[in-house]
Amino acid sequence: MQATALSSGFNPLTKRKDHRFPRSCSQRNSLSLIQCDIKERSFGESMTITNRGLSFKTNVFEQARSVTGDCSYDETSAKARSHVVAEDKIGVLLLNLGGPETLNDVQPFLYNLFADPDIIRLPRPFQFLQGTIAKFISVVRAPKSKEGYAAIGGGSPLRKITDEQADAIKMSLQAKNIAANVYVGMRYWYPFTEEAVQQIKKDKITRLVVLPLYPQYSISTTGSSIRVLQDLFRKDPYLAGVPVAIIKSWYQRRGYVNSMADLIEKELQTFSDPKEVMIFFSAHGVPVSYVENAGDPYQKQMEECIDLIMEELKARGVLNDHKLAYQSRVGPVQWLKPYTDEVLVDLGKSGVKSLLAVPVSFVSEHIETLEEIDMEYRELALESGVENWGRVPALGLTPSFITDLADAVIESLPSAEAMSNPNAVVDSEDSESSDAFSYIVKMFFGSILAFVLLLSPKMFHAFRNL
């Protein structure tokens, strides 16, 4: 699927301005067929780039815990140095969602979001409707979304926090004797990924590590950003020759798991009776069709992530009950269950009095933590019978977390391959086309149903309240 200026995240409703180029964070795998190494073993899940987009090959480690062994700087940096020549100019590209910085940015930001074919997945014959649907949803949702952003100060803090994370990662790499330029590329708002890539080219980077700031892989987050990068790199002769490694997911890294456990353990101590607190993981949801029809590994990785964190807490003597639910569903389709709002009501009614919310999909504070969790879900929980509410902060600039991301960058350097490498591109069918006729039929009638629902007064009202 060829990315266009629209689907690549450029804002068609505002003029381009000069913006500085911040930087971004970590995730595993590649624009080419790349596997990262830890202690001589391949890491994570292998992904290939095809003429039609991303395609999963194999899950190298079914059990995430098999790759969470401790990694020391001495091992990883020495290994990286043995593969990276002294003349290499290293770049690190941190990828993130982006967010409106003012209330006037909200509607065009939402347009960019819903114009992404990885967010609203239409069959190819109907992709000409993408912009129309995106325009409708963004206009309908903008008033309610503006209320949310107004409640947290008038805009998203995501860019500022991501810039700070980029600076911290750069300093951590310098402390490990790795000189690198660190860039930030946002998917749906400034600084767009395209801007960061142009700066990478201008700076003549000769080896690049791409680090999405999403611990778990999803088609709608890391996958969408990689699709844009794939298109940009293939079209540019210079970029096509730059060795690139992508850290596609990193939820199973020991540093990440320990950092999450540290924050949870610390917040539990703020309760009068820490042992009685329900640990409530709230993850960003995705449509069920992504998992069942498109092969998105997000749900599996999220469940493995929670298992790893709880195992670490158990090893520390923290034996609290826990629950996982999914938030932020949009529209009439089925999303991953259970839903956060419904579970909170059930927990309150069942007698849970103390609850600690853990935003497990997010490494930065933004609208879904500051407004959705801290305001909407907190109020709902208290109304439902929960008496003591707490929330674990996003990882942000937690030193152990930043150090681990820097280590992930160092470990991935040897695996970088140029896009022009013929072995780096494998022409295989993606999961959508395994039964193309059936898929198109389903999506055609699904699209008709979606339009009927969207245009009905009841559905219009529902979208205004999302």
Swiss-Prot record:
Principal localisation: plastid
Q: Which UniProt keywords apply?
A: Chloroplast, Heme biosynthesis, Iron, Lyase, Membrane, Mitochondrion, Plastid, Porphyrin biosynthesis, Thylakoid, Transit peptide
EC numbers listed for it are 4.98.1.1
Principal EC category: lyase
Entries under Pfam families matching the protein: Ferrochelatase
Named in its record, the pathway it takes part in is: Porphyrin-containing compound metabolism; protoheme biosynthesis; protoheme from protoporphyrin-IX: step 1/1
What Gene3D superfamilies does this protein map onto?
3.40.50.1400
Tissue expression per record:
Expressed in roots, leaves, stems and flowers. Present in both leaves and roots.
Q: Which GO terms describe its cellular component?
A: chloroplast; chloroplast membrane; chloroplast thylakoid membrane; mitochondrion; plastid
Q: Where is the transit peptide?
A: 1-35
Phenotype when the gene is knocked out: No visible phenotype, but decreased heme content in roots.
Q: What does this protein do?
A: Catalyzes the last step of heme biosynthesis by inserting ferrous iron into protoporphyrin IX to produce protoheme. Produces heme for photosynthetic cytochromes, but does not seem to be involved in stress responses. May be involved in wound-induced supply of heme to defensive hemoproteins outside plastids. Regulates the expression of photosynthesis-associated nuclear genes in undeveloped chloroplasts through production of heme.
Q: Which family does it belong to?
A: Belongs to the ferrochelatase family.
- Which protein are we looking at? Ferrochelatase-1, chloroplastic/mitochondrial
Native organism: Arabidopsis thaliana
